[in-house]
């Protein structure tokens, strides 16, 4: 009965049309248009159906028209068959607007449906695609912003494009067409395990997530709980993503055990007394820079799912590493930031002054942060590397002006051609709570302003913790007789930043003010 109810909940014959106004019409837009034709069939959660896709993209700065008959000479970026299904966990169950996963295929599924790799909207050639459906993220840019900021630093980050989607002639609003972490040459570029001379030391990807798959690997170690003690009731779950469990039968015997061993080797090291050893410690098993880059992206966004859900790790085999100049240690990539950047009202997700890696000390959940992130942060050498990397970030992509410029550019993209207005007319997101909003804005501008304020506060916190701070210059000052000064502050030069100034709620009348003192009665004395 439970399975039946779940299946019914996961699909509807009307394919979840817009809830505010299902009659919104798209005539023209600055965004690419994705037409999906399911011919009236019901889209399913667990099984794929055959559909057709056509993508119109006349190029940057050009208008795309929804009336194909009236505008027959438009550029068709791609047209063909796809195998389509719903995707996502919380993004599906808690959202009126449903995300899709699809694969490009040469023929309908009923005729074999062989996969075909294509490039969509300039993204890397592959056959596995996602249409994210931003709903709780009312800015619709949190994933895009995080990926674009992190792209120069990590080895691979998904590329993505905002689009407008039409399903069976009905307008469904703004979506994000994105690559997903995968084995393809233009993704993580993984071979089949054993493909390189039978080497079973890598070329796989695992995902730290829930135990909601039929097959997964449960770590022999437990995460830390509150008070820094190990919580033996909680587990670290590794899902098999590339290859999937179903693929093991067609791969060399022992592939699953080899994946488990590579996880064990890393975790055994972290659990050992000498894990900080620069040669034989954890640096032997993980690409430290990759883990730092993942950590900084996760902490900058204060992603409440970070480290413990949708956390992707991959590695190449030692043979490939030797032959192709790769690194065979575990690496990280990015995925799923729609409820990050102050967009969660649980686990203190709106706070800007906490660390996500330390979540286990504050919260209780079935999926906690793996123990080895705390082991990393407990290593002074790792902290030194982390701080140095953050300094590079702040001088590069994460500079205040660059972050603001990226946000403004994305906001303009979504508003200049009316896409945001149409999406709001269809779905009615603003002015109401959508799980798990920590902030409810009444307009797109409200949401963008909140995002900017939150980021500014988060950067201030991280800079204070990770960057060298200017030391206060304390020198003796003579205080007039009769005053017992608790604090003496020298007047700041005119060039000092206002953020560093000391302010009081009463005006000081003097010109110039060289020094002032505050006595035990809170009286201000200027001299």
Language-model features, listed with the residues they occupy:
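Hydrophobic h-region of N-terminal signal peptides that target proteins for export
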Residues: 2-10
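N-terminal module-boundary/linker segments of secreted carbohydrate-active enzymes
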Residues: 11-73
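Middle-to-C-terminal accessory/interaction subdomains
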Residues: 30-32, 42-44, 48-49, 91, ...
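Conserved oxyanion/phosphate-binding beta-strand-loop segments in alpha/beta enzyme cores
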Residues: 69-133, 255
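Structural recognition of the beta-strand scaffold that forms the well-ordered cores
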Residues: 100-103, 127-133, 140, 148, ...
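Internal "kinase-insert"/substrate-recognition segments embedded within catalytic cores
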Residues: 106-109, 123-134, 153-158, 170-296, ...
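Secondary-structure capping and domain/repeat boundary segments
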Residues: 469-516, 523, 527
């Amino acid at each position: 009965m439970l399975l039946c109810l779940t299946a019914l909940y996961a699909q509807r014959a009307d394919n979840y049309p817009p809830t505010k106004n299902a009659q919104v019409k798209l005539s023209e837009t600055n965004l690419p248009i994705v037409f999906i034709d399911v011919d009236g069939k019901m889209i399913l959660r667990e099984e794929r159906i055959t559909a057709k896709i056509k993508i119109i993209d006349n190029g940057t700065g050009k208008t795309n028209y929804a009336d194909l008959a009236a505008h027959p000479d438009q550029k068709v970026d791609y047209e063909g068959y796809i195998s389509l299904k719903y995707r996502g966990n919380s993004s599906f169950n808690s959202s009126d607007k449903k995300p899709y996963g699809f694969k490009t295929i040469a023929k309908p599924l009923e005729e074999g449906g062989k996969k075909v790799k294509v490039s969509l909207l300039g993204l890397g050639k592959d056959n596995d695609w996602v249409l994210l459906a931003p709903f709780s993220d009312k800015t619709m840019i949190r994933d895009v912003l995080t990926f674009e900021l992190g792209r120069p630093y990590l080895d691979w980050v998904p590329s993505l494009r905002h689009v407008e989607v039409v399903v069976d002639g009905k307008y469904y609003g703004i979506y994000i067409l994105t690559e997903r972490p995968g084995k393809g040459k233009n993704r993580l570029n993984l071979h089949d395990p054993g493909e390189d001379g039978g080497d079973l030391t890598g070329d796989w990807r695992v995902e730290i997530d829930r135990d909601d798959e039929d097959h997964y690997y449960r770590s022999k170690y437990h995460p830390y709980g509150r008070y820094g003690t190990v919580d033996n009731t909680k587990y670290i779950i590794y899902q098999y993503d590339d290859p999937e469990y179903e693929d093991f039968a067609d791969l060399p015997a022992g592939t699953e055990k080899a994946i488990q061993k590579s996880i064990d080797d890393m975790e055994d090291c972290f659990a050992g007394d000498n894990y900080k050893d620069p040669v034989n410690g954890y640096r032997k098993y993980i690409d430290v820079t990759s883990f730092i880059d993942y950590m900084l992206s996760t902490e900058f966004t204060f992603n409440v799912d970070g480290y413990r859900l949708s956390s992707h790790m991959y590695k190449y085999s030692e043979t490939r590493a030797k032959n192709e100049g790769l690194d065979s240690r575990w690496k990280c990539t990015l995925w799923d930031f729609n409820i990050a950047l102050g967009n969660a009202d649980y686990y203190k997700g709106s706070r800007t002054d906490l660390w996500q890696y330390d979540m286990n000390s504050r919260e209780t959940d079935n999926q906690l942060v793996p123990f080895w992130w705390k082991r990393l942060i407990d290593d002074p050498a790792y902290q030194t590397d982390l701080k140095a990397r953050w300094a590079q970030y702040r001088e590069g992509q994460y500079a205040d002006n660059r972050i603001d410029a990226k946000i403004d550019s994305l906001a303009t993209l979504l508003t200049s051609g009316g896409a945001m207005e149409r999406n709001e007319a269809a779905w009615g997101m603003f002015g109401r709570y959508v799980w798990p909003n920590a902030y409810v804005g009444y307009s797109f501008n409200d949401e963008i302003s909140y995002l900017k304020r939150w980021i500014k506060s988060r950067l201030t916190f991280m800079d204070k913790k990770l960057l060298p701070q200017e030391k206060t210059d304390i020198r003796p000052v003579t205080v007039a007789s009769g005053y017992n000064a608790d604090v003496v502050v020298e007047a700041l030069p005119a060039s000092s930043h206002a953020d560093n100034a000391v302010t009081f709620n009463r005006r000081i009348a003097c010109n110039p003010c060289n020094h002032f003192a505050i006595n035990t009665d809170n009286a201000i004395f200027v001299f």
